[in-house]
Structure formats: C-alpha cells, structure tokens
Amino acid sequence: MSRVVVLDSSALLCVLNGEDGAERVAQLMPSAVIGAANLAEVVTKLRERGLSVEEVEEVLGGLPFDVRPLTSAQAHAIGHLRPATRAFGLSLGDRACLALAAELGLPALTADQAWAGLDIGVQVELIRG
C-alpha cells in the first residue's frame, strides 16, 4: 500500500494539468486524502477554465482519493495558522490543507514552493524541488 499524504489543491491540479511532478502525485493518489475546501478550490479552477458542471464531475469523479469534510476543529486551526503563515502568503485553502495534515499526522503534498520555509509542525513535501 502507498503511503498516505494530504493533497493540496496544487497537487491535484498538477495531475489534472499534466505538469512536472504529476506522476509522483498520481502514484500517491490511491491512498491520498484531500480536504473538501481544497477540492472546492480545484472545482473552482476547472469551472474558471470553462468546464461545465458535467465535465468537472467527469474529470474528478473517477479519481481515487478520500475527501474529508471541513470540521469545526480544523476551522479553528486554519485561523490559528494565519499569524505563522501570513509572511509566506498562504491562502485559507493552503491553511485548510495544513490543518487537515496536522489533525491526521500526515505530510502535506504541494506544488507551492512557498511552503518550503514553513515551521509549523507539519511535514511538507514539495512535488518539485
């Protein structure tokens, strides 16, 4: 069985866009976890590119990952992460991924190079770099 990671939206978009690092992410996807907030970011990006509702559901429907809901505890953690991540320019979605990774004790997988400098008690793995 593959090791388990928490996917940032950038990791999933990397696969969908066929970017560098997509193979690495694709190998981890069958055992990966993604938060509902990060999945919403991916849906938003696909819709902004002009995909229809049906096309988005077709693209995402067959992907093998475990979607986790956003909990109240995660919402608080997202807010509490703001001071430590503000200088890195992390969005609410970025912090949602990190909060889920912290809650589950799993590494967060991202394409966002800005995460490399984080020191918040969550293991960050960069897809490229």
For each predicted feature, which ranges?
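Histidine- and aromatic-rich ligand-binding microenvironments
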Residues: 7-8, 34-36, 90-92, 112-113, ...
